[in-house]
């Protein structure tokens, strides 16, 4: 059954999983958004529109994203964690921001079935559209967009990459 298959599935020492993952592009970005007028806005709408912009960019290019996560913080302890596990799925929220804010710190992490350059462009386009719609200033602190196989060749394992991301 499906449940039995899930219980027996492991990504460790699973060559089929490793081969599939090696074809994906890894994307990471850290950024800061703030309103240009200093007013507070619905930051959940900003996150939603950003993810929808990414989804539409992938659909236009006939690509997909098995893993897209955003983590956004604003104010004291207020945060949002959203996930998209494919362009045909709804956005899932582990947490949404409780109130409007004037600024937002965000991490975008994705593994996508898309070549690196088109993925980077569509991410930039989605962010530009959100900034224009909500009149936001954006400061990007870090962007990484590369095929996972390239990361492996460079000696960066997924665990190393995740630990670097946490720093």
Please place each PLM-identified region on the residue numbering:
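P-loop NTP-binding site
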Residues: 4-167
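Internal gly/pro-rich beta-alpha loop/helix module
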Residues: 1
């Amino acid at each position: 059954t499906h449940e039995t298959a899930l219980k027996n599935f492991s990504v460790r020492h699973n060559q089929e999983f490793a081969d599939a993952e090696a074809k994906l592009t890894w994307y990471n970005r850290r950024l800061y958004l703030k309103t240009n007028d200093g007013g507070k806005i619905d930051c959940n709408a900003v996150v939603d529109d950003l993810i929808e912009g990414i989804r539409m960019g992938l659909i236009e290019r006939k690509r997909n994203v098995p893993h897209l996560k955003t983590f956004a913080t604003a104010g004291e302890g207020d945060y949002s964690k959203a996930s998209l596990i494919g362009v045909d799925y709804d956005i899932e929220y582990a947490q949404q921001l409780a109130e409007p804010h004037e600024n937002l710190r965000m991490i975008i992490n994705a593994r996508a079935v898309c070549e690196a350059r088109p993925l980077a462009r569509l991410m930039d386009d989605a962010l530009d559209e959100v900034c224009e719609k909500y009149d936001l200033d954006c400061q990007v602190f870090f962007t990484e967009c590369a095929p996972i196989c390239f990361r492996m060749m460079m000696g960066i394992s997924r665990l190393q990459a995740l630990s670097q991301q946490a720093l």
